[in-house]
UniProtKB/Swiss-Prot annotation:
InterPro entries referenced in this protein's UniProt entry, alphabetically: LpxK, P-loop_NTPase
PANTHER family named in the record: TETRAACYLDISACCHARIDE 4'-KINASE, TETRAACYLDISACCHARIDE 4'-KINASE, MITOCHONDRIAL-RELATED
Annotated GO MF terms: ATP binding; tetraacyldisaccharide 4'-kinase activity
Organism: Methylobacterium sp. (strain 4-46)
Pfam families linked to this entry: LpxK
Role noted for this protein: Transfers the gamma-phosphate of ATP to the 4'-position of a tetraacyldisaccharide 1-phosphate intermediate (termed DS-1-P) to form tetraacyldisaccharide 1,4'-bis-phosphate (lipid IVA).
Pathway: Glycolipid biosynthesis; lipid IV(A) biosynthesis; lipid IV(A) from (3R)-3-hydroxytetradecanoyl-[acyl-carrier-protein] and UDP-N-acetyl-alpha-D-glucosamine: step 6/6
E.C. no: 2.7.1.130
Oxidoreductase keyword on record: no
Protein name (database record): Tetraacyldisaccharide 4'-kinase
NCBIfam families: lpxK
Taxonomic classification: Bacteria, Pseudomonadati, Pseudomonadota, Alphaproteobacteria, Hyphomicrobiales
Gene Ontology cellular component annotations, sorted alphabetically: plasma membrane
Length: 332
């Protein structure tokens, strides 16, 4: 689905106020569900999540955490629900054998970096991670899922939108009332403009939570290849506008944009229309890494990957927290 604009307007607009009673019921049900005790995992669980629906930068953050854990000598594996995929799991993702329709787009992307297990049953998925040789699990999303006990949870925020109008779905973007979500959070990561992120950093500090700052940095080689090139950009992610702005920032000549819903399954007709327009106008098609795995392998399309870049002090703090976690829990 595509997030409605009124989610991000504060104070809440008329559509949000009309939906607020439904949001209150949804939020109360979510809060009750989140209060259930989780099953223990066979090794430490690091959860990367967010308090809102939509894109915040969780996948680049999960990849960065796995890289840090490897530097610390750990053997991380990713655990994902496999949103958008048809296979319930638990199964290990093989990018050469599985498609996004089977396991979801995010698992295909992160499986290039570390063993990745897709499982709707999170405790069963955690057992599969351990069987695959992992001694620490990076749970991609799942902050609100109570089925598996987490040892450390990082809540990722987009500084540009924050918590929107502060209301639960469908009146706003919150997955549950904030009061029910804060106790689940071990640390906060705010991605984007530092000035816009100050209220979030202050809210974390008021709760005694470590608050990290980061940005999504485009891959240097891909950025150089796109600089000065006329492009037709398309994306089916939580906030396509962020991707389009990244292209402008690296110097691509943005001649057209096409936004699709998050996790969009591209149809043959849509792909053909994009290719025809790009050919007719002499443009290069460009999309995100996450969209690329949902497209035919033979399709000619450029990609602008991004990675999480942290302020040096925050990178050191994150490394120290992960090292302490590994020292403090070596088993179930």
């Amino acid at each position: 689905m595509r997030a409605p604009d009124f989610w991000w307007r504060d104070p809440p607009s008329l559509p949000a106020r009309l939906l607020a009673p439904v949001g209150a019921l949804y939020g109360a049900a979510a809060a009750r569900r989140m209060a259930r005790p989780g099953a223990p995992a066979p090794c430490p669980v690091v959860c990367v999540g967010n308090v809102t629906l939509g894109g915040a930068g969780k996948t680049p953050t999960a990849l960065a955490l796995a890289a840090l854990l490897r530097e610390l000598g750990a053997r991380p594996a990713f655990l994902s629900r496999g949103y958008g995929g048809s296979l319930p799991g638990p199964l290990r993702v093989d990018p050469a054998a599985h498609g996004a329709a089977e396991v979801g787009d995010e698992p295909l992307l992160i499986a290039r970096a570390a063993p990745t297990i897709v499982a709707r049953d999170r405790p069963a998925g955690a057992a599969a991670c351990a069987a695959a040789g992992a001694d620490v699990i990076v749970m991609d999303d799942g902050l609100q899922n109570p089925s598996l006990r987490k040892d450390w949870s990082l809540a990722v925020f987009d500084a540009g939108v924050g918590i929107g109008n502060g209301l639960p779905f469908p009146a706003g973007p919150l997955r549950a009332p904030l009061g029910a979500q804060w106790p689940l959070v071990s640390a906060v990561l705010v991605i984007g403009d530092a000035a816009q992120g100050r209220p979030l950093l202050a809210a974390a500090a008021a709760r005694g939570l470590p608050a990290l700052r980061g940005r999504l940095a485009p891959d240097a080689a891909a950025a150089a290849a796109l600089r000065g090139r006329p492009v037709l950009a398309f994306a089916g992610i939580g906030r396509p506008d962020k991707f389009f702005e990244s292209l402008r920032a690296v110097g691509a000549e943005l001649r057209g944009t096409r936004a699709f819903p998050d996790h969009h399954a591209y149809r043959a007709g849509e792909i053909a229309a994009l290719e025809r327009e790009a050919t007719r106008r002499g443009l290069t098609l460009v999309t995100t890494e996450k969209d690329r795995v949902r497209l035919p392998a033979a399709m000619a399309v450029a990609v602008l990957p991004v990675r999480l870049a942290l302020a040096p002090d925050d990178a050191a703090l994150l490394r120290a927290r992960l090292a302490a976690l590994l020292r403090g829990r070596a088993g179930p």
